[in-house]
A protein has these predicted regions:
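Bacterial N-terminal signal peptides that target proteins for export
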Residues: 1-7
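Bacterial N-terminal signal peptides
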Residues: 9-16
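Boundary at the C-terminal end of the N-terminal hydrophobic targeting segment
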Residues: 19-21
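C-terminal cap of thioredoxin/glutaredoxin-like
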Residues: 34-48, 71-72, 83-91, 175-252
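Short N-terminal binding/cap micro-motifs at the start of the first secondary-structure element
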Residues: 45, 77-79, 110
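Local sequence-structure signature of Cys/Sec-based thiol-disulfide redox active-site neighborhoods
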Residues: 59-88, 99
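Structural alpha/beta surface segment adjacent to cysteine/selenocysteine redox centers
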Residues: 83-184, 189-190
């Protein structure tokens, strides 16, 4: 299979998934101005202030025919919704793709009031609706019982995990998402981050050290890259071939 053919089939796979998702019908209030209110019709957790500043930011260095740069966030409900498709993509095209996971910083803090959201409890009902739409288990009660004040801590922890092992870092991301979406755990708390690290074979002590130092810089670099590439929300995937040609899939 040629590189061009590989890219074509992979893009077709993702575009079909996007179209199938957008064909579902669900009536929800239009609150997508707030990033925590992901729009099921487009599959996007929006970043209202994102602006594109540099279209040539990425230089491809992949060893496989296609590199996918995946901008995501640990508490992005649409990103949780795309998990089955992403796993299928890896199973069908794993020999031809490599995925570069990047953090986008969905929720810096609660110092804003946008799109009908002013406090964590406003998100609870929305997550329940998203669960029905994607047919993925999500328990919105986390926002009533033990709400998160930011998505930055688990994002930085993921960058620290990547410093140890890329494969284990992906497993770590899956685990902390299970914690927040299924188990109602506040994954900004170190006790849960440390537990997820240990369960996925990471060195929790080293993770803590990196989390407090180098991982912060790596996370900030991801935010800058997202800004430069014009990422407006999550999930966003850039498909790049060996000639540095790019295609973007936005939403789900």
């Amino acid at each position: 299979m040629t590189k061009a053919t590989t890219l074509f089939y992979i893009m077709s796979f993702l575009i079909a998934s996007v179209c199938n998702g957008q064909q579902k019908q669900l009536k929800m209030e239009n609150k997508i101005n707030n990033p925590l209110l992901c729009d099921p019709e487009t599959g996007v957790c929006e970043i209202p202030t994102a602006q594109k500043t540099n279209d040539n930011e990425i230089v491809s260095d992949q060893k496989k025919p296609v590199k996918i740069i995946y901008f995501t966030d640990p508490i992005c409900s649409s990103c949780w919704g795309i998990e089955p498709q992403l796993r299928k993509l890896k199973l069908e095209y794993g020999n031809n793709i490599e995925i570069d996971y990047r953090m986008g910083g969905l929720l810096p803090n609660w110092s804003y009031n946008s799109g009908g959201i002013s406090k964590p409890s406003d998100v609870a009902h929305h997550w329940d609706e998203v669960s029905l739409y994607y047919d993925m288990p999500i328990d919105g009660d986390i926002w009533l019982e033990n709400p998160l004040n930011s998505s930055y801590p688990p994002s930085i922890a993921f960058k620290a995990a990547q410093m140890q092992d890329e494969t284990k870092a992906v497993q770590f991301m899956r685990r902390i998402r299970e914690m927040v979406f299924l188990e109602k755990k506040n994954i900004t708390l170190w006790e849960h981050i440390s537990k997820a690290a240990s369960e996925t074979g990471l060195d929790a002590v080293k993770l803590k050290t990196d989390y407090e130092t180098k991982a912060i810089e790596l996370f900030e670099a991801d935010l800058e890259l997202a800004k430069n590439m014009g990422v407006r929300g999550f999930p966003t995937l850039f498909f790049i071939d060996s000639q540095n040609n790019k295609q973007m899939v936005y939403g789900f």
